[in-house]
Amino acid sequence: MDNAKNSGITTEWVDNAVKPGDDFFRHVNGRWLDTYEIPADRSKDGGLYTLRDDAEKHVREIVERIAKEQPESRIGALYNSFMDTDKIESDGLEPLMREVAPILNAATSEQLAVTLALLSRAGLAQLLGWYTSIDQKDPEHYVFYLTQAGLGLPDEAYYREEKYEQVCAAYIEHIATMFELTGLAESFNLTPMEAAQLIFSHETEIAAHHWDVVKNRDAEAKYNPVKATELDEKFPGFPLQQWLLALGADPKELGTVIVSQPSFLEGVANMWQSTPLMTWKLWALWCAIRSRAPYLPDAFVQENFNFYGRTLSGTEELRERWKRGVAAVENALDQELGKEYVAVHFPPEHKEKMLKLVNNLLEAYRRSITNLDWMTEATREKALEKLSKFVTKIGYPDEWRDYSKLTLVPGDLFENLRRAAAFNSDFMIDRAGDPVDKNEWLMSPQTVNAYYMPPANEIVFPAAILRPPFFDPEADDAANYGGIGMVIGHEIGHGFDDKGALYDGDGALNNWWTEEDFAEFTKRTSALVQQYNAYTPANLDPQKFRVNGELTLGENIGDLSGLSIALRAYEIALAEQGITSLEDAPVIDGMTAAQRLFWSTAQGWRTKSRPQHAEMMISVDPHSPDEFRVNGVVRNIDEFYDAFDVPEGSKLYLAPEDRVRIW
């Protein structure tokens, strides 16, 4: 027995009234779930959010120091202008009115289209979404993507499903209140409520052309290349080429555009012709108001929070202003902040320990794929080739983004928001068609998260997630493999989930499977879909809400693969120490190694949500609720049954033949 090491395990919240085999998530976290009160300014809280709180405090220290010492700097100018509530109140509606004047003055649909593009470049929500990213069939170059947008509610389902009727009614009231505050409905000879009802009706029609969350996961269906100079011909009705020019993207120079949801573009192009200009202008005003509401006087901030915070998420109190100010700086200058953050908060030895963990996870995947009994050699060879080409990024980028051409103005919040958004817009537009920057990160080092990028075939772990409860360099290996090891395995697993498996080792959307193997893969993943379709979070009504197994499939494969392979990787780490089996690993604090590994996963996902937030996320989030990121996974892993002596008849029990095994 070895009690010398820090186990990395917390047992203070265990609920012994609940058996591990009935509800492992609650067994590990039950007393915390029963007694913990979510802070009033958030809709969800837990272990992951402790990390986010720490990162936020660290970033606040950086931002406030720079804002005080260098008020003319980009960080100082933006933060101080956000925090200057006296000026914001005295300016009133004037900054917004300057911004929306082109909407009010648009005399033709062409003028309005140009205005929508200019406002989109300045960071306001509009009809069309767009971005530049890696071309999924030519992963050596960037390409411009056009996507569906235009809604003020989280998803198109809100506009058509009966269970959201109360939310929709509250949304209409919210729009009316905002128009009452601005007085802008009078410009259209409408009352605020008439304006709100017209806007909601218009958004409902836009929503009818949206792809749903499941269809939107189909990478092949969303890859529709069109020459930018042929967009008007392909989608007549909306002046797309004129819109692109106003955005700053010359169609002649842009080359190819990937249209993600062509039926959406066709639908709204037809709407553009058939709907009165006044309706489009009124709706565009609403887009501007809701985009800028967090930066207007307090009456707007409070009303915006009343709907998007209280009604949609159940949050009781608005976050402190400094937190919102830090978030605004993060949104505009994430890497400039990141460079400052890692200089203080990421010891180099963390990177070395992480690399060891990652390499063991990759080796465990290699061994697993090599020994899969359901895969033919032709597919196995391609899978191993893809695995060998994985790129790992840990901590922070080797090269930082250059912000030197962005100048922000002390004392002018709206101008700073516009300049920062335009800088980012131009950055994206300018690189369309360029070779891919292999050093780029899509997350800042101070972000508590991780990701897999299919077209780059890379896994990325920002510095801020490399802390307890997920990663503790002083803890026993079992806790780290159950924590950050599971996260690493999850991200690698995305390379082989139902979407990632469609990309080859070079990142191209290119089917490398034999027909026979993909049919077997689909059979196994379909069983996982059926399992998750039966789940409802403990705080929701199962008659109204269930997990969408198709929407969450990719993340569920990542979770199951991640924990299964983390267990194999831990065995590799034990073998390097001369320990040949899990059973021979040290017992620490009365827990076996396997128990500690599973426990670490369950404590890592210890979270609690408000019901309103849970309702929203179950509809739009591709991740399963956290309780099923634990229970839905462990019940499919044989070693869990052995570790906790789970008998047949337990609530989580699955017969061996019903346990899903993929990787």
Q: What function would you assign to each model-found segment?
A:
Residues 35-39, 130-131, 155-157, 210-212, ...:
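Short, solvent-exposed loop/turn and secondary-structure capping segments
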Residues 2-5, 18-22, 27-90:
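Active-site-surrounding "flap" and adjacent substrate/cofactor-binding loops of secreted or lumenal enzymes
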Residues 2, 237, 258, 262, ...:
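Intrinsically disordered, low-complexity linker/terminal regions across diverse proteins
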Residues 64-356, 360:
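Noncatalytic, helix-rich "gating/capping" subdomain that lines the substrate-entry/channel surface
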Residues 40-63, 188-209, 480-486, 589-590, ...:
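Short secondary-structure subsegments characteristic of cysteine-rich extracellular domains
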Residues 5-9, 152-156, 543:
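Flexible glycine/proline-enriched surface loops and loop-helix/loop-strand junctions
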Residues 13-34, 158-180, 553, 560-565:
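Hydrophobic/aromatic-rich, well-ordered segments within soluble, folded domains that form packed cores
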Residues 16-20, 136-138, 452-455, 590-592:
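Extracellular/periplasmic catalytic domains that process cell-envelope and extracellular macromolecules
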